[in-house]
């Protein structure tokens, strides 16, 4: 019998949970070094620029043309943070800072607002909502998803089964590249 419990937590807390054997597996986007935890790259996904359907942005947009005061900011990964700091400074004024996507869709209805987000989420919003994906030059790097697990993972063959099914599923998503 297998029981699946899913908890959302920051990457560093996921590492501690795996290291302390409070969790068998973690899926993270910000890798760290922990002696007793393996970090395995699984897949990567492009981050895209998304705005409301009526926003004035056009394809070929440059980050230097953007006003961070119109941004709905979510810190997707460390590489995204470096890109963002490069273009907008270390402490830019943003319209809204979120730590999850619950309010993201509604906030994109505000005038001239924009957000950077994973391509799969952007595609869903563009297909089902009044949103658009706009191509951006010099955009952020792909976001990598990693599996983290205890060094003694061979004790849990279900982890390998789960990861194989996960990769088979996400491998069919056009915006995702398996690693």
What are these regions (language model features)?
Residues 1-34, 98:
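Central regulatory/effector-binding core of bacterial HTH transcription factors
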Residues 15, 19, 39, 63, ...:
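Short hydrophobic/charged patches on amphipathic alpha-helices used for structural packing
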Residues 17, 21-22, 41, 70, ...:
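Conserved functional loop/turn residues at catalytic and ligand-binding sites
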Residues 30-31, 53-54, 76-78, 119-121:
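Short secondary-structure boundary segments
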Residues 34-41, 45, 103-152:
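Beta-alpha-beta core module
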Residues 36-75:
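Flexible hinge/capping segments at coil-to-helix
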Residues 57, 67-91, 155-159, 163, ...:
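Secondary-structure junction motif
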Residues 135-176:
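A late-sequence structural motif
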């Amino acid at each position: 019998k297998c029981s699946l419990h899913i908890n959302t937590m920051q990457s560093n807390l996921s590492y501690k949970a795996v290291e302390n054997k409070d969790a068998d597996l973690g899926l993270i986007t910000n890798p760290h070094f922990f002696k007793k935890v393996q970090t395995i790259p699984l897949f990567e996904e492009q981050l895209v620029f998304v705005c409301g359907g009526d926003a004035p942005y056009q394809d070929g947009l440059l980050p230097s043309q953007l006003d961070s005061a119109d941004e709905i900011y979510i810190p997707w990964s460390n590489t995204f943070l470096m890109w963002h700091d490069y273009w907008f400074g270390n402490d830019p004024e943003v319209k809204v800072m979120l730590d999850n996507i619950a309010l993201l869709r509604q906030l994109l209805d505000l005038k001239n607002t924009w957000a950077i987000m994973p391509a799969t989420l952007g595609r869903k919003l563009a297909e089902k909502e009044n949103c658009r994906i706009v191509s951006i030059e010099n955009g952020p790097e792909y976001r990598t998803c990693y599996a983290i697990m205890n060094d003694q993972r061979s004790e849990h063959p279900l982890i390998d089964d789960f990861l194989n099914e996960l990769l088979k599923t996400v491998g069919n998503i056009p915006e995702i590249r398996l690693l």
